[in-house]
Amino acid sequence: MNLSDAEMFERMEEGWRSGLPRTVCGGGSLPLFTENARRVLPLWCARYDIESVCDAGAGDMAWREGMLWNIDYTAYDLIPRHPSVQRWDITAEPLPRVDLILCRMVLNHIQPRVPQTLALFKQSAHYLAATQYGDDAPQRSKQFYRLDLRKWLGEPIEVVQDGPEDFGQLALWRLG
């Protein structure tokens, strides 16, 4: 079943769950599938002198389980699912100024609004870490687009597999 944005938003606000244990946010938040992200993000922060991070799409924070990360971290989501997550619409207004915006498994849900969202990100951060797919990745859903962000951002400066092979990659771009 393919839901419209409005229908999906309504389901989420009513407490829709992904049906997975430990998280309401889907497979991309499971500890097994976030292992590489939890490993490389602190390394990238050290390598590029990143001291502050906005997590744009933090969800229920399940993905960070057990992660040691010595940075100034602020979590945002359109529908906060954890007390430390603040409500924010990344498609409508720039995030507070930070070194890095982390937007893992989020842009893929807002495909028509990706260009305007990336323009807002460029106003807010020096770097972006986001989910990346190759240009030949097959589309499987109208709720999750396998986006090749190189179309808007060029080649990333870092790339790592993000979860199982079909989950795509976590890539890092310099925004300005």
Stretches with model-predicted labels:
Residues 125-136:
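Conserved beta-strand signature within the Rossmann-like core of class I S-adenosyl-L-methionine
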Residues 139-163:
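Conserved Class I S-adenosyl-L-methionine
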Residues 160-176:
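Core SAM-dependent methyltransferase catalytic element
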Residues 51, 99, 126:
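Conserved acidic residues
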Residues 1-91:
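Conserved N-terminal segment of class I S-adenosyl-L-methionine
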Residues 109-124:
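A short, conserved alpha-helix within the catalytic core of class I
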Residues 92-97:
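Short conserved loop adjoining the S-adenosyl-L-methionine
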Residues 99-112:
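A short SAM/SAH-binding and catalytic strip from SAM-dependent methyltransferases
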